Amino acid sequence: MANKGPSYGMSREVQSKIEKKYDEELEERLVEWIIVQCGPDVGRPDRGRLGFQVWLKNGVILSKLVNSLYPDGSKPVKVPENPPSMVFKQMEQVAQFLKAAEDYGVIKTDMFQTVDLFEGKDMAAVQRTLMALGSLAVTKNDGHYRGDPNWFMKKAQEHKREFTESQLQEGKHVIGLQMGSNRGASQAGMTGYGRPRQIIS
């Protein structure tokens, strides 16, 4: 954390590649959504990766965000009156957000690790988590999402089909198109191409 030195060599290359994945246009969209979803009292961060990290680092804004997606009376994360100043309390607040986001439906592969945000290791992963959360909120369409629905992609939803017993029986008598046909093209009347191979001793 505070006493971690700069990375060199291969570690530096890896960190550089991770930092290049950060999308500044996406940052603007996420900031707009968080402000609309949570209210203007959350403030606005300085532009750029570092400003975005500092804004979200203590976990309070993230907790307010996930709470705003739930109805009153069933908020999953307790938000402290005063933002926590102790490091472990801040990390605990971020961990509570991650747990609530997972309970909301964000899959584990879309989740960032606490250190990704806290140490600024992988802010692109933080963006991915927030995008997944926004997409889920738009898809659920339960009245708690605020903002432009075009900011996030709507996830595909399951469409189960129910068949009656008679429909299932009728389906057994249908010949599928992949089973072929006894009409149409055939080799009747065709002659072989070219002459057969001549083997002379």
Curated annotation (Swiss-Prot):
Q: Which residues cross the membrane?
A: none
A matching Pfam family:
Calponin
Residue positions, PTM N6-acetyllysine: 172
Q: Tell me, using the record's free text, what induces this protein.
A: Overexpressed in senescent human fibroblasts.
| Record's keyword terms, sorted | Acetylation, Actin-binding, Cytoplasm, Methylation, Muscle protein, Phosphoprotein
* Chief place where the protein resides: cytoplasm
One GO term under biological process is: muscle organ development
Q: Calponin-like repeats span which residues?
A: 175-200
What SMART domains does the annotation carry?
CH (SM00033)
Task: Cite the GO molecular-function annotations of the record.
Answer: actin binding
Q: Which CDD domains match?
A: CH_TAGLN
By its UniProt entry, which PROSITE patterns does this protein fall under? CALPONIN_1 (PS01052), CALPONIN_2 (PS51122), CH (PS50021)
Record PTM Omega-N-methylarginine, positions in chain: 183
Residues modified to Phosphoserine: 166, 181
Q: Which GO terms describe its cellular component?
A: cytoplasm
* Purpose of the protein: Actin cross-linking/gelling protein. Involved in calcium interactions and contractile properties of the cell that may contribute to replicative senescence.
Family designation = Belongs to the calponin family.
Name by which UniProt lists this protein = Transgelin
Source organism (scientific name): Homo sapiens (Human)
